Structure formats: C-alpha cells, structure tokens
Amino acid sequence: MLRRAVLCLALAVTAGWAWAAEEEDNVLVLKSSNFAEELAAHKHLLVEFYAPWCGHCKALAPEYAKAAGKLKAEGSDIRLAKVDATEESDLAQQYGVRGYPTIKFFKNGDTASPKEYTAGREADDIVNWLKKRTGPAATTLADSAAAESLVESSEVAVIGFFKDVESDAAKQFLLAAEATDDIPFGLTASSDVFSRYQVHQDGVVLFKKFDEGRNNFEGEVTKEKLLDFIKHNQLPLVIEFTEQTAPKIFGGEIKTHILLFLPRSAADHDGKLSGFKQAAEGFKGKILFIFIDSDHADNQRILEFFGLKKEECPAVRLITLEEEMTKYKPESDELTAEGITEFCQRFLEGKIKPHLMSQELPEDWDRQPVKVLVGKNFEEVAFDEKKNVFVEFYAPWCGHCKQLAPIWDKLGETYKEHQDIVIAKMDSTANEVEAVKVHSFPTLKFFPAGPGRTVIDYNGERTLDGFKKFLESGGQDGAGDEDGLEDLEEAEEPDLEEDDDQKAVRDEL
C-alpha cells in the first residue's frame, strides 16, 4: 500500500514537472501542453509567437529577454513568454498568427481577446507599454528619489509638475498619459521634486538621454498640445534606422522622412552626420531625419528601393509616406548642413519635383516577344494610341513573379505577330512612372489603344488562357480591383509572412 502511494506521488510530481514551463533568460517557454496553465498562473502575460529562422525574431530576442529580466528584478507580476509557432502550429492558428514575430498580451487569463503588442522593439519600449497596460497612466512621484528612478528608467520620460493634482491641467496631463503607449509618465505635487528639477510653477517636462536632455512644455496644458509637444521631442534629432527603431520611425505621425545613406566606415562619417544633425534642428516636428548605415547588409533592400548603390553613398533622399509614397532627390550631391537645409525648405515650399527612377534603356529592349520597359520609354510604349499594351510590373526577388515568368513569356510568343498587341514587363524596383503606382508584385495592367490614357487592372487567373481571354475581350474578362495581389514584402521561404510591423516598414521603404 505504501509502495503504491509513493508511486502515485512520484507520478504526480513528474506530471507536474512535465507541465511546468521552462525559462530561457527569464522568458517562459510555452507549449500546447502548458499554455493554459501558465495563463492561469500569471495575471499579466506577454507572449511572443516566433519562428527560429525569422531574422526579426532573432533581433528582438536580446531586448525581449532584457525586458523580462528587468520586470522580474522589480518584482513585477508581469511575465514574458514565447512560443515556437513552427512547433506549436495549433496555438499559432488559435491566436491568428500570420507573421513573425506576433506578440500578444493576455490579461487575467483572457484568451478571447488578447491585445496585440504594437510598440517598439527595445526593452524600454516593452516594459513601458506593459506598465501602461497594467497600472496607472502616470506614476505618483512622492519624492526626488521616485522622480530620479522614473527619469533613469527610460530613454524618454515625462513628468507633470502640478501643486494641485486635481486641477484641470493635471487632468489634461493624465489624458495625454493615457494616450501614450511607449513613454513612462510621472505626476508630482512634491516641493522636493519641484526643487530637484528647478521647476518653479506648474508645468510639464520631457526628459531624454540624448540631444538637449530635457524639453520644457510652454503654453496652455491640453491633451492635444501635450501630445504634439511629445511628438516633436521624443525622438533624437537624427535617428538611426534599425530593427529596434523601425516601429518608432514608421509608427509616428511625421510622414516626411529625409534619409542620409552614409557608410559607418567613411572617413568623414562624423562630419557628415554632424552636418545632417545641424540641419535637423530647423525641422523638428516637420521632417524626420534618419541615418542609414549603407554598409550594413540588412539595409541593402532600402538602397535598392531608392535606386542607390553602395558606391554612390553618402547620399540623401527624401520620401513622403502618405497614401502614395513619393521620393525626392537633391539637385546637388553636396551634403552640407546648408545644402540639406535649403533642400528641405524648398520641399516644404512645394518647389521640388518628385524623383522617378529609371534604368538605362537596353539596346535590345524590343527584340524579344516580351518587350522590356524602363522609366524612360514607358510613356511612349504604354500610351501608344495604336497599341494594346499589357504590362507586368515585377520585382526580381518576388517568388510569384518568378512563377509567372514562363507563362508571361508564352503570352509574348502567342501575340508576337499581332501588330496591335504588345506584351511587356518592367522591373518596378528600379523604375518608376508617374502614371502607375505599384503597391504589390506582380501587378498586371492593361493600356488599351485609343486616346484617354486608360489603365485597366487585371485581377483574373494568372494562366495563359486567362490572359488570352482578357486580351481578346478587350480588357473586360478578368478586369477588377487589385485585392488579390501579393504583398510587396512577400516572404519567399516561410509559409507565413514575416512580422506585420517590419512588413510595413519594407512596404513603406
């Protein structure tokens, strides 16, 4: 009897061990077998669904672990966890994982509606976002030690100094705090804290570990004005584009970005960056100044997007990220503070024309059944009033474009003797035209003969028969909206798209 009891106890303990989550660098490792138990055990749980091959996941890993360690050291009840979605496909499907990394926040074990994590990829961003979701919008600062701890805890922190924390201004401050995900806010009425930071009347101060160190808010305290003040001052004058900073860059409200492509190894690196920073001072809140290390392998796609080669750097380009992306190029290659300032000012005044990339026209562009278009000959060919022109806009790296290539070649062969039908293709990563905005690959458009510069989208089957029916119907059978096209970012190796936030970055760059 005793032996049976001991055996049962051993089995129970072993089973308990089997269900318990392991930890890696303070991050819980979750599986289907322990997911529900860990949700029940932790009131606040942030879960990353990742893939071992995902570059963005690898870049996030040290910051994610750092955030987990920081919260654990503070004695917080917030825990961080991760799930290998390639191994735990049922969990990934259950929680709608369509890209890597996908990060979801579970509160009180609620599996019905976990909140999507949308902030930055640095440890401070993660910690601040979680604290905003689990505590007050602003921490009450009773003394200087508490204030110093808050300021030291993050790259950027905001403190409201109000002698009456129930005042209308203080309430507006709290509304701004509630609307800001990724920055810690503190609220104080302590004369000790006022004195420590040399604040002599009610006000708001943004503290930061870069540039001028602090910014004092001036004017009437309203939620909208505070948010505008924070937007203008929370980022460095010049911010480097990295995996970690990308969400801050593209998640902000400033949609005009000027980019300095500069090799970190350049002899005049510091001087060029200093001039760029000097120019940035006059455009805070209007234009975001971004430095891109043109030597870094991860940034080569961005160079390609702007039609740049490494040997052409340093170089400056400007882009607007509204509904339609538009690029601009300085007339001069001189990268002085004065030259960059003048370029930005002329852009804001509407005096700069968009820059459209074009390859050189190949000598044999029209010798094959499928004609080769570049920016320089597009208008002449596509809008020839005597021709019906069917164009594939492709990217060399796009898997679906590669699959389409032999079919498109057969289509060219089929119509090579037709005098009024032209089958063509254009590499849209190296050529841009004002008449067509390409948002996905492959994009197929038909330019029928006749006046009026008509453009018809093709959204039918990507088969030879489908294309023939479309052409023989005069662009009717298969015409439609572009809702079936592949994403610009399109990952070729994985079954799932990579991380939505990073996809947006590449969509916009």
Curated annotation (Swiss-Prot):
Residues bearing Phosphoserine? S332, S358, S428
Site annotation (Lowers pKa of C-terminal Cys of second active site) points to R462
Its UniProt entry gives the catalysed reaction(s) as:
Catalyzes the rearrangement of -S-S- bonds in proteins
| Compositional bias segments (type: Acidic residues) | 479-501
Task: List GO molecular-function terms, semicolon-separated.
Answer: protein disulfide isomerase activity; protein heterodimerization activity
Region annotation Disordered: where it falls in the sequence:
471-509
Q: What is its main location?
A: endoplasmic reticulum
Q: Please give one Pfam family short name.
A: Thioredoxin
Query: Per its UniProt entry, which superkingdom is the organism in?
Result: Eukaryota
| Keyword S-adenosyl-L-methionine listed | no
Question: InterPro entries from the entry?
Answer: PDI_thioredoxin-like_dom, Prot_disulphide_isomerase, Thioredoxin-like_sf, Thioredoxin_CS, Thioredoxin_domain
What modifications does the entry list under PTM / processing?
Answer: Phosphorylation of Ser-358 by FAM20C is induced by endoplasmic reticulum stress and results in a functional switch from oxidoreductase to molecular chaperone. It also promotes interaction with ERN1.
Q: Where is this site: Contributes to redox potential value?
A: G55, H56, G399, H400
The residues covered by the Thioredoxin domain are 19-135, 347-476
Site positions per UniProt: Lowers pKa of C-terminal Cys of first active site: R121
Q: Cite the entry's keywords alphabetically.
A: Cell membrane, Chaperone, Disulfide bond, Endoplasmic reticulum, Isomerase, Membrane, Phosphoprotein, Redox-active center, Repeat, Signal
> What is the membrane topology noted in the UniProt record heading this document?
Peripheral membrane protein
What are the annotated disulfide bridges? C54-C57, C398-C401
Question: According to its UniProt record, which residues of this chain constitute the active site?
Answer: C54, C57, C398, C401
Cite the record's note on assembly. Answer: Heterodimer; heterodimerizes with the protein microsomal triglyceride transfer MTTP. Homodimer. Monomers and homotetramers may also occur. Interacts with P4HA2, forming a heterotetramer consisting of 2 alpha subunits (P4HA2) and 2 beta (P4HB), where P4HB plays the role of a structural subunit; this tetramer catalyzes the formation of 4-hydroxyproline in collagen. Also constitutes the structural subunit of the microsomal triacylglycerol transfer protein MTTP in mammalian cells. Stabilizes both enzymes and retain them in the ER without contributing to the catalytic activity. Binds UBQLN1.
Put simply, this protein is called Protein disulfide-isomerase
> Which organism is this protein's natural source?
Oryctolagus cuniculus (Rabbit)
